[in-house]
Amino acid sequence: MTRLTMNIAIATVIAATLAGQASAEPVKIRAGWVVAPASLIPVLFAKPGLARHQGNSYVLEPVYFSASPAQITAMSVGELEIAALGFSSFPFAVQNAGLADLRIIADEIQDGGKDNFSTHYMVKKDSGIATVADLKGKVLATNGVGTGVHMAMRAMLQRSGLQDKRDYTVIEAPFPTMKAVLLDGKADMIVSTTPFVFDPELQARARVLFTQRDAMGTSELSFWTAREGFMGKNRAAMVDLLEDSLRAVRWYLDPANRTEAIDILARFLKQPPARFESWIFSKNDFYRNPDGLVNLDALQNNIDLMRQLGIISTDLDARKHASLDLVGEAAQRLK
């Protein structure tokens, strides 16, 4: 091969490589969410300038689901890249849905973390119920049997010697209807969370008997998960996404941006801004770790409690399913 021919060949290879890189499509990352603003996924990049890698290395596609089990199904069939799961759903994804390669990659919200808001279990002020033991023979409302808040309820009552069905009755009601369920006498105790717990009438006529933190300590309510194979093939794009997401979360948490942040949420949820002003992005809200770090000790305690209550049949080591190195790398970029 002559020198000229060799140079032409090298130039051709370089040109082809550069063309391939230039035409490479950004990685589509579909991310599931269930409830906003607990999950910020649908509004994460509503503020221009936060998603600096969006459209280059990745494209984020928020996908709404009515409940966590639907995300697990979507993940199983390859229709979702990131599932926002919690302590009460993650073990089922790993143990029952065949997602042994599912990894915990970033935090979303914690109940009771850093002395922030914890879910309230409330009774009427004139009910005569002063202690958990007074719930014997009563009707208790939860948003769903088997949910995290139901598990906390069971744990707290069991601590006082009360067993489900034997000592009390559980009914189901959506969170928005809980106030009416309590005040109309359909249940003696309800579960209430943000924003419903701040309803003026509920605050005036009911009181907190205990919180979820009282029942089980800090709870890992929601965290991002992804499959190991996808992360291995698309590590750079995932780190870019996590960098942008941390930048966005920090922007939302900054008191200087609170008015604009509330306006974004209000527009998305079609609610008046006043509905959020007393609690969102404050101590009255669930804790959001600005570095995206999952509290693995809390998560392990949550999972162990599930085992003790017989909700899951085998032990699960949360740390063996955690891959927090990506979010750690993303956080380092923002320093």
Question: What annotation goes with each model-predicted range?
Answer:
Residues 25-163, 169-172, 188-191, 218:
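Short, glycine-/small- and polar/acidic-enriched structural segments
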Residues 232-313:
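Secondary-structure end/capping motifs
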Residues 303-335:
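Conserved C-terminal helix/tail region of periplasmic/extracytoplasmic solute-binding proteins
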Residues 1-9:
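Bacterial N-terminal signal peptides that target proteins for export
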Residues 18-24:
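Sec/Tat signal peptide C-region and signal peptidase I cleavage site
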Residues 88, 176-268:
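Pocket-lining segment of extracytoplasmic ligand-binding domains
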Residues 11-12, 22, 54:
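Cleavable N-terminal signal peptides
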